[in-house]
């Protein structure tokens, strides 16, 4: 019987957040901090010919104004990835070439925001405007080269050809696609488009910085990736990493947006240069425009099957809008391969490819789902179409082709297998939840509305195999309590609670005995940060191992004081006794004794862990919608989800993860769109124009779990944070198609698209 694993604890920081305790970056800004505001480009692509800041500098209270002439000329990447990261080093703190509307032109530093805003219009900039690259289909060999510079650096080749606006070119082929397609009895094909979407975290991007008494620049930021940010700052400023400290308070949401450095390098430059505290806060328009989005991608897909229902060919090719910088472009596009094609493991030939192109849009970056969301959208739609063409139940077709435990996919590494997965059980459970086999999948609700059901499956990963590792230290304090040190980032999902549960389960102590210290590069051991669904699987396993080491040391010390062998000591996490009960001592008595005298020793456990594999969590979903035949408006009624994420460490937090991901998926499917004008200006740059769903827009959410046991993960756990966003778009698309015959293949599926694609017999 587990003491903590599987228990639905509240988040350890929930009371402080609910009662308004200072928690976020903005709560800790020094009162004397200078304010940084950013002058931004009105053009999508231009070269700065001249900048005159003389009048602006005369405004009382203006401390400094910096342009591209004042900053180091060292290129870096903003992507939060373990070195050597594959994202191109194509950014400068300030660049003489601007590449999207909103790109940074100058930094205005003043005593307060009002003064900075007063000075900004007085800066005179002369631009040489170029024709922008705004269409992914014409980006390659466009007359405008988005990155004409010769000093872009790549750590590894990713098929780049910058003079042609190609930042990524990747193709994976196994088997002969054309030959195998010729043998198939059924083939479906199509072109699908998934739009750029915005993470839209509640907390905007912000950071403050200062130079400490040791002459080091300290950055406090809302970031998921403190160690990666430290490395990027050091490179950009040309200083040793030992001169940089990065720490984060609590984050008000990230969803991948804060896996990319945003404000931190500009803040660090100003603080380092002026040797004064400074603060940079993006407003909502800047947060929407000047960070990163999910990559927009257009797909061409072919799926072929034999008459006995075996999917033999999957052919997926795409073009990807990287935006102004190739931030995360290679890894998001290639990640989709590993998290889509393995679903259907009877295939004998596959092709997965993409060209990532530079464009004059907001840079693409990390967003929950990280490539899997994009790739599963066309694949799951195609599988549903294949089932329709074959006249079979789409659930039955999937279950016949699904990868099984112990199998190896065509796209897996030679030593990579599916070690755990109750995928068939997961599908069966979601079918029960939605009564899939007991009712029609399309029906009339009344004269105006029709209802429909739709299905989709999804995989994800758990960390980045063979690359990312996590280190955790747990110390026994002088009072008998414990401190867990981690570089992972709590950003609202409850990771500190889960790590505490895993560590306390090993030690055997109550949850209140453990405090978590996180995300301070001076204090905690290395962790790449909270991304790639890695925290529970990678950091959690390291926490379990560190706790095991510490527990062993504690028992050994009890044995010393009892003058007996360790085998004769029983320790329940608080009290130790000899097996005969003759001697007893609790941890609060032991701890201070360990820190007195010449043989004093503070006990700690330490572990570093990474995995050769990235075990996939699995999700099966059924969407139920009603469609207005007069307008094409889609109204979500129910969304049923069943997830295999291995052992569920905390059911309450896991359920919240599922619900949050599903809500974001509904937003991507029906409402959200990063939309640009003809000259490249972002039109959906605030929360009035960029529509995210509210509680009234999502229907009822139904969630359940099927628990497999992952042998490589701590307590059998896999990830859950990202897979939950991957089924919404194709499941809702399938439900719409079943309801009114509208086969909408571009996201979002807004009423106009649905109505135009609706079967004529349903239109009112």
What are the language-model segments listed below?
Residues 231, 245, 252-275, 279-280, ...:
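Thiamine diphosphate
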Residues 75-80, 119-122, 230-232, 255-261, ...:
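Short acidic, glycine/serine/threonine-rich loops at helix termini
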Residues 69, 238-243, 273-279, 307, ...:
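C-terminal catalytic domains of large/alpha subunits in multi-subunit enzymes
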Residues 7, 13-19, 83, 88, ...:
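Glycine-rich loop/linker segments at domain edges
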Residues 1-159, 187, 273:
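Flexible, low-hydrophobicity surface segments
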Residues 462-524, 538-539:
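Catalytic phosphate/nucleotide-handling subdomain of diverse soluble enzymes
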Residues 146-237, 402-481, 611, 683-697, ...:
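Helix-loop-helix junctions that connect adjacent transmembrane helices in secondary transporters/permeases
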Residues 15-16, 121-128, 132-134, 224, ...:
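Extended active-site and interfacial segments that coordinate phosphate-rich ligands
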């Amino acid at each position: 019987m587990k003491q903590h694993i599987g228990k639905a604890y509240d988040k350890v920081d929930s009371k402080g957040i609910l009662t308004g305790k200072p928690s976020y970056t903005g709560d800790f800004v020094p009162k004397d901090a200078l304010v940084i505001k950013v002058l931004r480009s009105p053009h999508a692509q231009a070269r700065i010919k001249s900048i005159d800041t003389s009048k602006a500098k005369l405004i009382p209270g203006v401390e400094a104004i910096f342009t591209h002439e004042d900053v180091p000329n060292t290129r870096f990447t903003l992507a939060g990835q373990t070195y050597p990261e594959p994202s191109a080093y194509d950014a400068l703190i300030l660049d003489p070439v601007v590449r999207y509307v909103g790109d940074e032109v100058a930094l205005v530093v003043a005593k307060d925001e009002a003064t900075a805003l007063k000075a900004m219009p007085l800066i005179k900039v002369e631009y040489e405007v170029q024709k922008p690259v705004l269409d992914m289909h014409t980006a390659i060999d466009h007359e405008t080269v988005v990155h004409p510079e010769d000093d872009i650096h790549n750590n590894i080749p990713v098929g780049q050809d910058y003079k042609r606006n190609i930042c990524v070119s990747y193709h994976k082929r196994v088997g002969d696609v054309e030959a195998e397609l010729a043998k198939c009895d059924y083939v479906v094909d199509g072109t699908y488009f998934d739009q750029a979407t915005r993470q839209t975290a509640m907390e905007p991007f912000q950071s403050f910085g200062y130079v400490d008494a040791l002459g080091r620049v300290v950055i406090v930021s809302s970031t998921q990736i403190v160690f990666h940010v430290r490395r990027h700052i050091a490179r950009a400023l040309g200083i040793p990493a030992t001169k940089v400290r990065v720490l984060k308070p609590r984050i008000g949401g990230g969803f991948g947006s804060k896996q990319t450095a945003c404000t931190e390098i500009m803040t660090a430059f100003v603080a380092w240069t002026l040797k004064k505290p400074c603060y940079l806060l993006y407003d909502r328009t800047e947060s929407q425009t000047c960070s990163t989005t999910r990559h927009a991608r257009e797909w061409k897909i072919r799926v072929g099957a034999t008459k006995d229902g075996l999917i033999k060919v999957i052919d997926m090719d795409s073009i990807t809008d990287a935006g102004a910088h190739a931030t995360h472009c290679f890894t998001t596009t290639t990640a989709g391969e590993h998290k889509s094609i393995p679903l259907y493991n009877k295939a004998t030939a596959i092709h997965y490819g993409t060209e990532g192109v530079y464009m004059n849009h907001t840079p693409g970056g990390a967003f929950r789902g990280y490539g899997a969301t994009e790739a599963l959208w066309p694949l799951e739609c195609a599988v549903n179409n294949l089932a329709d063409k074959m006249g079979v139940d789409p659930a039955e077709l999937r279950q016949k082709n699904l990868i099984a435990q112990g199998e190896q996919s065509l796209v897996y590494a030679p030593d990579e297998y599916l070690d755990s997965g109750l995928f068939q059980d997961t599908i069966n459970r979601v079918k029960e939840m939605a009564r899939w086999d007991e009712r029609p999948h399309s029906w009339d609700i009344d004269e105006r509305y029709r209802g429909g059901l739709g299905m989709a499956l999804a995989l994800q990963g758990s960390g980045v195999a063979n690359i990312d590792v996590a280190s955790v230290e747990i110390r026994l304090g002088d009072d008998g309590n414990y401190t867990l040190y981690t570089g992972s980032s709590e950003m609202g999902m409850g990771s500190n609670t889960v790590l505490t549960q895993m560590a306390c389960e090993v030690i055997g102590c109550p949850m209140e005995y453990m405090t978590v210290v996180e995300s301070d590069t001076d204090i905690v051991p290395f962790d790449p940060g909270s991304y790639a669904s890695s925290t529970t699987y990678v950091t959690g396993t390291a926490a379990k191992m560190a706790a095991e080491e510490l527990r062993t040391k504690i028992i050994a010390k009890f044995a010393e004081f009892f003058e007996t062998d360790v085998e004769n000591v029983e320790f329940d996490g608080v009290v130790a006794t000899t097996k005969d009960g003759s001697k007893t001592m609790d941890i609060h008595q032991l701890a201070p004794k360990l820190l007195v005298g010449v043989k004093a020793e503070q006990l700690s456990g330490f572990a570093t862990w990474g995995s050769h594999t990235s075990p996939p969590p699995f999700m099966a979903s059924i969407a139920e919608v009603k469609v207005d035949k007069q307008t094409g408006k889609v109204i979500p009624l129910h969304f049923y989800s069943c997830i295999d994420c291995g052992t569920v460490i905390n059911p309450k937090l896991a359920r919240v993860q599922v619900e949050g991901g599903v809500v974001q998926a509904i937003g991507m499917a029906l409402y959200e769109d990063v939309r640009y004008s003809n000259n490249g200006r972002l039109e959906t740059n605030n929360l009035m124009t960029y529509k995210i769903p509210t509680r009234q827009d999502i229907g009822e959410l139904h969630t359940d779990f099927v628990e497999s046991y992952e042998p490589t993960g701590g307590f059998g756990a896999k990830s859950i944070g990202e897979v939950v966003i991957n089924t919404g778009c194709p499941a809702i698309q399938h439900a719409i198609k079943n309801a009114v015959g509208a086969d909408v293949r571009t996201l979002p599926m807004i009423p106009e698209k649905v109505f135009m694609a609706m079967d004529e017999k349903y239109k009112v």
